[in-house]
From Swiss-Prot:
Keyword check for Isomerase: yes
Protein name listed in UniProt: L-rhamnose isomerase
Taxonomic superkingdom: Bacteria
Gene name of the record: rhaA
PANTHER family with a match to the protein in the record: L-RHAMNOSE ISOMERASE
Length: 419
C-alpha cells in the first residue's frame, strides 16, 4: 500500500466520521451487494445457438469493434479478464442462447446439461449465476409474438422454453448455493394501431401461469418478469406493459424487473423502487443507460445510477433487490464496457453507503429542507474516492484508470487475433 493511499484513506475516515459514517462498515456492506454482470455484452447478444443469425426482438447492438467472443471459451476468458478489474462480489447473468452443445438443441428442449460448463466455471470463480429464457432471434418469434402468440402451437413452444429455462435456473441455484434469478422478457407487440389489446394479454397471463406452475425451491430459483414501453417494430403496442407485469408480479408474488431503459424517457426507475416494494416480494434491476430510447449504452456514474443505488441503501433493501446490468455497446472494447459499467454501479453503491442517511431523514422529518439540500450537496465533496481506492486495493484490483492498460494488453495479445 502506498503512503499516498494510506494518507488519503486516513483523511477520508476522519472526514466521514465527522458526519457519523463508519467507512469500514460501509465497505462491509458493499461486500454484501453483488452485481450481476450480463454475458451478452461480450458478443453483442449473438449467443452460441446460431452466432451468425440476426438479432431480433426490437433490440440492437450497434458498432463493429474487433475482437468479440466467438465461443464459450472466449467469452469466459473475456469475463475473467473483466472481473479481475472489478472489486467485490459479482454474479453472471446468462441467456438461454449461450448453451453449449455439439448438436443443435431446440429451445424447448434445453436442459441443465447444456450449461454444465458454465456451472463448473462459476464454481471455480466463486460466482452465482442468473438466467433468462431467450424469446427472440428465432424463427418462431419472427412475427413479433411468443408467449402471447395466437397460434397455440407456437405459444406452447415458448411456454415449454420458459419451463425448461426455469429448471436450468434451479439447477444453477442448487449447484452454486445461491438462488438464480430468472427473468422473463418477451418482445411481443405491434408496430401500428392495435385493435384488440386485450386478447394477447389474456393469452400472456395464461401462458405465464403455466410457465410458473411447476413448484421450484425458492432457495434455488426466483421468477422475475420484465416490462417494456416499446421496441423497434413494436412502437404502438407492447403486450407486456408495466401495468401488466406490476399486476402480475403483485398477484402471483413473483419478482418484478425494472429496466432503466424500458420506460418513457421522462421516467426513472429509481422513483419506482419504493412503490413496487410495497407490493412485490423482490425486485430485479436492470441498470442501463437509455439515450433517447432503450439504447443500452454503458452505465455511467450519473444522477440516475446514483439515485438507484441510494434507494437500495436508504431503505435497506439489500435482501430484496437483485442488481443486474443490461447494456451492450459494440462500438468500444467490450471488456472495457463491462469494467466501466460495473465499476460505476459499485461506485454508486459505495457513495450511497457513505451518506449520512439518518441525519438527512431527521432534517426531512423536521421540515428543514434547506439543511437537507445543503447536506446532500456537501456530501458530494467528501473524499469517497479515497474509500473506493482502498476497497479496490483490498480486492487486488486497480484503483484508478490503470485498469485500462490491462485491457489494452489483453486486446493486443488476445482480442486482436480473433479477426
Amino acid at each position: 500500500m502506498t503512503t499516498q493511499l494510506e494518507q488519503a484513506w486516513e483523511l477520508a475516515k476522519q472526514r466521514f466520521a465527522a458526519v457519523g459514517i463508519d467507512v469500514e462498515e460501509a465497505l462491509r456492506q458493499l461486500d454484501r451487494l453483488p452485481v450481476s454482470m450480463h454475458c451478452w455484452q461480450g458478443d453483442d447478444v449473438s449467443g452460441f445457438e446460431n452466432p451468425e443469425g440476426s438479432l431480433t426482438g426490437g433490440i440492437q447492438a450497434t458498432g463493429n469493434y474487433p475482437g468479440k467472443a466467438r465461443n464459450a471459451s472466449e467469452l469466459r476468458a473475456d469475463l475473467e479478464q473483466a472481473m479481475r478489474l472489478i472489486p467485490g462480489p459479482k454474479r453472471l447473468n446468462l441467456h438461454a442462447i449461450y448453451l453449449e452443445s455439439d448438436t443443435p438443441v431446440s429451445r424447448d428442449q434445453i436442459t441443465p446439461e447444456h450449461f454444465k460448463n458454465w456451472v463448473e466455471w462459476a464454481k471455480a470463480n466463486q460466482l452465482g449465476l442468473d438466467f433468462n429464457p431467450s424469446c427472440f432471434s428465432h424463427p418462431l418469434s419472427a412475427d413479433g409474438f411468443t408467449l402471447s402468440h395466437a397460434d397455440d402451437r407456437i405459444r406452447q413452444f415458448w411456454i415449454d422454453h420458459c419451463k425448461a429455462s426455469r429448471r436450468v435456473s434451479a439447477y444453477f441455484g442448487e449447484q452454486l448455493g445461491t438462488p438464480s434469478v430468472m427473468n422473463i422478457w418477451i418482445p411481443d407487440g405491434m408496430k401500428d394501431i392495435t385493435v384488440d389489446r386485450l386478447a394477447p394479454r389474456q393469452r400472456l397471463l395464461a401462458a405465464l401461469d403455466e410457465v410458473i406452475s411447476e413448484k421450484l425451491n425458492p432457495a434455488h430459483h426466483i421468477d422475475a418478469v420484465e416490462s417494456k414501453l416499446f421496441g423497434i417494430g413494436a412502437e404502438s403496442y407492447t403486450v407486456g406493459s408495466n401495468e401488466f407485469y406490476l399486476g402480475y408480479a403483485t398477484s402471483r408474488q413473483t419478482a418484478l424487473c425494472l429496466d432503466a431503459g424500458h420506460f418513457h424517457p421522462t421516467e426513472v426507475i429509481s422513483d419506482k423502487i419504493s412503490a413496487a416494494m410495497l407490493y412485490v416480494p423482490q425486485l430485479l434491476l436492470h441498470v442501463s443507460r437509455p439515450v433517447r430510447w432503450d439504447s443500452d449504452h454503458v452505465v455511467l456514474l450519473d444522477d440516475e445510477t446514483q439515485a438507484i443505488a441510494s434507494e437500495i441503501v436508504r431503505h435497506d433493501l439489500f435482501d430484496r433487490v437483485h442488481i443486474g446490468l443490461d447494456f451492450f455497446d459494440a462500438s468500444i472494447n467490450r471488456i472495457a464496457a463491462w469494467v466501466i459499467g460495473t465499476r460505476n454501479m459499485k461506485k454508486a453503491l459505495l457513495r450511497a453507503l457513505l451518506e449520512p442517511t439518518a441525519e438527512l431523514r431527521k432534517l426531512e422529518s423536521a421540515g428543514d429542507y434547506t439543511a437537507r439540500l445543503a447536506l446532500l450537496e456537501e456530501q458530494k465533496s467528501l473524499p469517497w474516492q479515497a474509500v473506493w481506492e482502498m476497497y479496490c486495493q483490498r480486492h487486488d484490483t486497480p484503483a484508478g484508470s490503470e485498469w485500462l492498460e490491462n485491457v489494452r494488453t489483453y486486446e493486443k495479445e488476445i482480442l486482436s487475433r480473433r479477426g
